[in-house]
Amino acid sequence: MNGTEGNNFYVPLSNRTGLVRSPFEYPQYYLAEPWQFKLLAVYMFFLICLGLPINGLTLICTAQHKKLRQPLNFILVNLAVAGAIMVCFGFTVTFYTAINGYFALGPTGCAVEGFMATLGGEVALWSLVVLAIERYIVVCKPMGSFKFSSTHASAGIAFTWVMAMACAAPPLVGWSRYIPEGIQCSCGPDYYTLNPEYNNESYVLYMFICHFILPVTIIFFTYGRLVCTVKAAAAQQQDSASTQKAEREVTKMVILMVLGFLVAWTPYATVAAWIFFNKGAAFSAQFMAIPAFFSKTSALYNPVIYVLLNKQFRSCMLTTLFCGKNPLGDEESSTVSTSKTEVSSVSPA
């Protein structure tokens, strides 16, 4: 065995070294140099300083500007809420524990932090799925002239929270558990042990299939169809500047959406899968820590991709930041409704 399993923890170092101590009681400087913990604290502070204002500004703008409270924008607000949860309940805890060099909040704090971080991440993930389905329905029109209402948008948001809870809650009630991971400063599901008391294997398989593979499949299918539909419409209307513009905007958004998701979560999922299928194999604490902390950046660039590239949100944000005046002038605002109509009115060939 190349790791040490204890009460609610697993340290990726054999206790034959005599160095292993509980990550809830002692600094873990035998896993990584003290400067690495300080670097992690600086990194988390950076994410907090950027993530909280960006996500908070999205929520403030939506509250201030009535025109943003449209059904197709509800899911973007949900993304901001998910990002704020990750920042407030995940990043701040990791910042504190990194400064201390160990998970100083104990097993209960670990369970709460792991739950909130997983919940926020899963709400964001399923929000992307709902966003993909919404745009597929609006652009590809598989159900004909479907009017997307507030009821549909609210149902989509409720769905994201139900799916997120279905992933994040089981470890709190005995199906798997939340334990410190990486350099023991943040918590996540137990991919590491075969403890039959917690049925870790069945939970991890459920999580990978239902909360990673399934969402990825849906996202790729819906956006693949969306791009094909827009390209087909543009090919039939080659002289239409508006259709060409719609094609460019939608294609750019699709590429950024898919890349953003894969860049954030694929390294973490890949490493977790490797650890799960290679129980007992030797690996360093940094091997899991780096992708785990890198995935947290999704809370930062999600609003950049899904909100700041939305002309309507961008215009309102600038108006809010500059006390009611848009420094870019009226041109930015005037193109909002036109662009929205262009992308939404593309019909299948």
Swiss-Prot record:
<feature type="transmembrane region" description="Helical; Name=3">
    <location>
        <begin position="114"/>
        <end position="133"/>
    </location>
</feature>
<keyword id="KW-0597">Phosphoprotein</keyword>
<comment type="similarity">
    <text>Belongs to the G-protein coupled receptor 1 family. Opsin subfamily.</text>
</comment>
<feature type="transmembrane region" description="Helical; Name=5">
    <location>
        <begin position="203"/>
        <end position="230"/>
    </location>
</feature>
<dbReference type="InterPro" id="IPR001760">
    <property type="entry name" value="Opsin"/>
</dbReference>
<dbReference type="InterPro" id="IPR017452">
    <property type="entry name" value="GPCR_Rhodpsn_7TM"/>
</dbReference>
<keyword id="KW-1133">Transmembrane helix</keyword>
<feature type="topological domain" description="Extracellular">
    <location>
        <begin position="1"/>
        <end position="36"/>
    </location>
</feature>
<keyword id="KW-0600">Photoreceptor protein</keyword>
<dbReference type="GO" id="GO:0004930">
    <property type="term" value="F:G protein-coupled receptor activity"/>
</dbReference>
<feature type="transmembrane region" description="Helical; Name=6">
    <location>
        <begin position="253"/>
        <end position="276"/>
    </location>
</feature>
<feature type="topological domain" description="Extracellular">
    <location>
        <begin position="100"/>
        <end position="113"/>
    </location>
</feature>
<feature type="topological domain" description="Cytoplasmic">
    <location>
        <begin position="310"/>
        <end position="349"/>
    </location>
</feature>
<dbReference type="InterPro" id="IPR019477">
    <property type="entry name" value="Rhodopsin_N"/>
</dbReference>
<feature type="disulfide bond">
    <location>
        <begin position="110"/>
        <end position="187"/>
    </location>
</feature>
<keyword id="KW-0325">Glycoprotein</keyword>
<feature type="region of interest" description="Disordered">
    <location>
        <begin position="329"/>
        <end position="349"/>
    </location>
</feature>
<dbReference type="InterPro" id="IPR000276">
    <property type="entry name" value="GPCR_Rhodpsn"/>
</dbReference>
<feature type="transmembrane region" description="Helical; Name=2">
    <location>
        <begin position="74"/>
        <end position="99"/>
    </location>
</feature>
<dbReference type="GO" id="GO:0007601">
    <property type="term" value="P:visual perception"/>
</dbReference>
<feature type="glycosylation site" description="N-linked (GlcNAc...) asparagine">
    <location>
        <position position="2"/>
    </location>
</feature>
<feature type="transmembrane region" description="Helical; Name=7">
    <location>
        <begin position="285"/>
        <end position="309"/>
    </location>
</feature>
<feature type="topological domain" description="Extracellular">
    <location>
        <begin position="177"/>
        <end position="202"/>
    </location>
</feature>
<feature type="topological domain" description="Cytoplasmic">
    <location>
        <begin position="62"/>
        <end position="73"/>
    </location>
</feature>
<protein>
    <recommendedName>
        <fullName>Green-sensitive opsin-2</fullName>
    </recommendedName>
</protein>
<feature type="topological domain" description="Cytoplasmic">
    <location>
        <begin position="231"/>
        <end position="252"/>
    </location>
</feature>
<dbReference type="GO" id="GO:0009881">
    <property type="term" value="F:photoreceptor activity"/>
</dbReference>
<keyword id="KW-0716">Sensory transduction</keyword>
<feature type="modified residue" description="N6-(retinylidene)lysine">
    <location>
        <position position="296"/>
    </location>
</feature>
<feature type="transmembrane region" description="Helical; Name=4">
    <location>
        <begin position="153"/>
        <end position="176"/>
    </location>
</feature>
<keyword id="KW-0157">Chromophore</keyword>
<dbReference type="InterPro" id="IPR050125">
    <property type="entry name" value="GPCR_opsins"/>
</dbReference>
<keyword id="KW-0297">G-protein coupled receptor</keyword>
<keyword id="KW-0812">Transmembrane</keyword>
<keyword id="KW-0807">Transducer</keyword>
<keyword id="KW-0472">Membrane</keyword>
<feature type="transmembrane region" description="Helical; Name=1">
    <location>
        <begin position="37"/>
        <end position="61"/>
    </location>
</feature>
<comment type="function">
    <text>Visual pigments are the light-absorbing molecules that mediate vision. They consist of an apoprotein, opsin, covalently linked to cis-retinal.</text>
</comment>
<keyword id="KW-0681">Retinal protein</keyword>
<feature type="compositionally biased region" description="Low complexity">
    <location>
        <begin position="334"/>
        <end position="349"/>
    </location>
</feature>
<keyword id="KW-1015">Disulfide bond</keyword>
<dbReference type="InterPro" id="IPR000732">
    <property type="entry name" value="Rhodopsin"/>
</dbReference>
